[in-house]
Swiss-Prot record:
Name under which the protein is recorded: TATA-box-binding protein 1
Organism (species): Zea mays (Maize)
Origin: domain of life: Eukaryota
Gene Ontology molecular function: any one: RNA polymerase II general transcription initiation factor activity
Membrane-spanning residues: none
Lineage summary: Eukaryota, Viridiplantae, Streptophyta, Embryophyta, Tracheophyta
GO biological process: DNA-templated transcription initiation
Sequence repeats: 25-101, 115-192
Chain segments annotated as coiled-coil in the UniProt record: none
Subunit: Belongs to the TFIID complex together with the TBP-associated factors (TAFs). Binds DNA as monomer.
Gene that specifies this protein: TBP1
Length: 200
């Protein structure tokens, strides 16, 4: 998932991350307005890294290798960029796509760039009693193991959705800024510790 050794080399700031665990950002979804109408067919024909199948989806799908991302480019000039591992990378990628569109002869601008969703993950390294957690936090939890193996926890403050797995692996989604991801994890950590599964 993340490059090994990157997170481990810096000591964790315990004032910000009392649990000692910093969630790794896995995917950033951002949007930007190129502020001009686009001929998707022309883009698909001219750009090397683009596919367009209007019967299936009304956008050009374009990919670049660095930062490794995918963009959805709509005729309205709206663009969605997904796959980056940090906010800066997401913005850099979006700028690269905008530049590609400019080079194809469209007067693309770069308006209203916005991070829409940050997905992070981490591992608390201990198993969790999901039934107990779901029972005591019923207002926030849905846990139906026949449908999905994880517990879905909808935190109100910050407004983050957490997927909590028996293994101790956690996925956090819905953040607009990374601090929300970190805060949500610190909020849930004592709860996870409380419902730690004791190995018999």
């Amino acid at each position: 998932m993340a490059e090994p050794g990157l997170e481990d080399s810096q000591p964790v700031d315990l004032s910000k991350h009392p649990s000692g665990i910093v969630p790794t950002l896995q995917n950033i979804v951002s949007t930007v307005n190129l502020d001009c109408k686009l001929d998707l067919k022309a883009i698909a024909l001219q750009a090397r890294n683009a596919e367009y199948n209007p019967k299936r989806f009304a956008a050009v799908i374009m990919r670049i290798r660095e930062p490794k991302t995918t963009a959805l480019i709509f005729a309205s000039g709206k663009m969605v960029c997904t796959g980056a591992k940090s906010e800066q990378q997401s913005k850099l990628a979006a700028r690269k796509y905008a530049r590609i569109i400019q080079k194809l002869g469209f007067p693309a601008k770069f308006k209203d760039f916005k991070i829409q969703n940050i997905v992070g993950s981490c591992d608390v390294k201990f198993p969790i009693r999901l039934e107990g957690l779901a029972y005591s936090h019923g207002a926030f939890s849905s846990y139906e193991p026949e449908l999905f193996p994880g517990l879905i926890y909808r935190m109100k403050q910050p407004k983050i959705v957490l997927l909590i797995f028996v293994s101790g692996k956690i996925v956090l989604t819905g953040a607009k800024v990374r601090e929300e991801t970190y805060t949500a994890f610190e909020n849930i950590y004592p709860v996870l510790a409380e419902f730690r599964k004791v190995q018999q």
